[in-house]
Amino acid sequence: MQIKVKKLEKEAKLPVRAHATDSGADLFALQETVLPARQISKVRTGIALELPENTSGCVWGKSSVETKGIKVMAGLIDAPYRGEIIVCFYNLNDTPFTFEKGQKIAQLVVLPTLYPTFVEGEISQTERAQGGFGSTGSK
């Protein structure tokens, strides 16, 4: 599958998978961006995509970034969207964090998408039922 990428800025980098079998393609910071402490910030990539029909783009964190206390606020890119890919982050730290120009900031995963219609009705019972939020214990 090929995905068309438009550079909105000359210095933008196209997404790159580090290894042929990696699920995610790295997204890069268009410019140096300082994330203030304990705040949400947006980081530009300088690219737009043309995702194939029946797919979506999911923006996920990179462990090399998130282990530094910088949390990607996961995003969903609909196939018809043609605007710039901008990644939102939350800096969990008490100090600012700087992304350098060209630094890997997040991962883009392209997934098949279903378009269900939601209808009201009774739902079947399962063994799990309503268990959630750690209901099975930690060990």
Feature map (PLM): residue ranges:
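DUTPase catalytic domain/fold
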Residues: 1-139
